[in-house]
Amino acid sequence: MNPGIQKLYNLAGKPGRIIIGLMSGTSLDGLDIALCKIEGCGQNTKMELLKFETISYTDDFKNEVRNVFSKKQIDLEKLCLLNPWISLQHAGMINDCLQKWNIKNSEVDLIASHGQTIYHAPQRLHQQQKFGNATLQIGDGDHLAVATGIITISDFRQKNIAAGGEGAPLAVYGDHILFSKKGEDRILLNIGGIANFTFLPGGDENILCTDVGPGNTLMDAYMQEKFPGTSFDHESLVAKAGTVNENLLAALKEDDFFKQNFPKTTGPELFNLHYLQQAKQKSDTVSLSTEDTMATINRFSADMIVIAIKDCLKDKTEIKIFSSGGGIHNPLLMQHLQEHLPGCTFLSTAETGVNPDAKEAVLFALLANECVCSDVSAVEIKSPGIPAVAMGKISFPA
C-alpha cells in the first residue's frame, strides 16, 4: 500500500486530528492560519481553536494576484506560474508559524487549503448555456504538501459544483456542525468580499445558505482606486464623511442578481468598479464626491444584506445573528445593519467560542476533517441547493 494512503487511513481512525485551516480571501489582506484540534465528525464534531494568526501579504504578492484576479483577459503564463508560487508562499508562512508556536510539522495531521480564488463563474453570471457553473482557485495542493511535509486537502469547491452546487458559499457545511442549536433560530452572517449567510433553524425548517451581494469588495476596490496604498475604509472614516445619494443607491440595486431566488452565488466578477461606474452613469452621479460615493456603497452593502435576511426570516421577528468576516470591523456598515434589523440580536461568533476573524479558516479545517473521516450521510443537510458531498482533493508530501 502507498504509505501516504496508509497514513491517511490511520488518521481517519484516530479519535481526533490536528488540522491547519487556511483562508485567503478576495480582499488579499493576508493568509488566515487556524490550528485546530478536531475530534469526531459530522454532528458529533468537537473543535478547539489552538492557535490563530493572519499573515499579511506583501505588496508584491497582492500585485501578482491582482494581475489575474477576476479578469476575463489575462496572461496565461502568469496564471501558470502563480499556481505553484502561491502554494510555496503559503507553505513558508505555515512553516514560520509552526516554528513560532514551537510545534513540529510532524505533529500536524492535515492542512486544509482554500487556495486563492481567481475567477468565480456561476452560470447565472456567465449565461453561456453549453457551460455549467465553474470556479477557479489556484495554489496547488501538491506543492503545499511537499513544502510542509503535511498531507494537504485542497480545491474544495470543485466537488460541490460537480454534485450540482455553484461552488459557493461553502460555509453551510461547517456552520451546521458548529453553530446549530435546537430550539433557537440562528443566522451566521459572514461579511467578506461578498456577503453571505447561513440560516440555521432551531426546528424542522430547511437550512439556507446563500450569497446576498457585495460585502467589502466594492468599498475596498473604490478605496484602493481613490487612495493608492490604502486597502479599505479604516473605521468607515471616508463613508462617515459623506451622505448617501438615493439616486445612485437605487441604480446599484437594479441588477437582476437581486431578483433571483435563494440560494445563489456571485463575486467581484459582477460587483466591481465597472458596476459602480455603470450605476453612476444611469443615475447621473458621475461627478459625485468620493465621500458621498463611499457613503452610498457602504449603505448599498448593508441594504442588500438586510433585504436578504428579511426575505429569509419572513414573519420571524426575533433572531440571533452571529457575525464574522472583515465587514464586522466596519462600524458604519454594522450600524446600518442594526438600525434596519431592530428585532435581531447582533453577536460575534466569539460568543460561541470561535474567533470571528478565524471562522472561515476553521470551516475549511472542518471540511478537511469531513473529507477524511465522514461518509455522505454525515454531511447531508437535506436542503435544496446544498449537495450532500464530502469535498477536497488529497495531496501527499512524497
Q: Model segments located where?
A:
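Glycine-rich phosphate-binding loops at beta-strand->alpha-helix junctions
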Residues: I118, E318-H340
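Short beta-strand-loop/turn "lid" adjacent to the catalytic site in phosphate-handling enzymes
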Residues: K72-I138
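Phosphate/ATP-binding catalytic cores across multiple sugar-kinase/actin-like superfamilies
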Residues: H90-C97, T290-T317
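Glycine-rich phosphate-binding/hydrolytic loop that grips phosphoryl groups
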Residues: L28, A295, R299, A350-A398
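Phosphate-binding/catalytic loop of phosphoryl-transfer enzymes
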Residues: P15-I18, L22, Q128-T135, D142-V146, ...
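Non-transmembrane, aqueous-exposed alpha-helical and coiled segments at domain scale
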Residues: G4-Q6, Q99, N105-S106, L248, ...
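Conserved ATP-utilizing enzyme core subdomain
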Residues: G16, G30-L49, T54-Y57, D204-A302, ...
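Conserved non-catalytic scaffold segment of RNase H-like nuclease domains
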Residues: T45-W85
